């Protein structure tokens, strides 16, 4: 049963369903590895919290300039307890290490997300 939150990517019975929701039967291999391996296994490992995994993922996506995936993971980081101020500071810090254009692109995505939730 899907939880009450309308935009959730988890299902109590089936686990993570974001890949299935995105691709359905179009890409079953990608759906399987995204939902069952990455989110149901890797993200659930105990040595790092979901919050820490979110920060690491945001850093990696920022470094690679992957703004499409970054949008989801910035929002997911917020769901995992990372504050907007922490995300802003992390993005500023990342700009020095990943290149200013990547930092600016990431900050633009974060601003869009916060603008949407503030209205």
What are these regions (language model features)?
Residues 1-51, 64, 71-79, 102-119:
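Acidic, glycine/proline-rich low-complexity segments that act as flexible tails and inter-domain linkers
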Residues 53-61, 90-91:
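Short, structured motif recognition centered on aromatic/hydrophobic residues
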Residues 60-66, 98-99:
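Short alpha-helix boundary/capping elements
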Residues 65, 87-92:
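Short, charged low-complexity intrinsically disordered segments located at boundaries
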Residues 82, 86:
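Winged helix-turn-helix DNA-binding recognition segment
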Residues 93-95, 99-104:
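Substrate/cofactor-recognition hotspot
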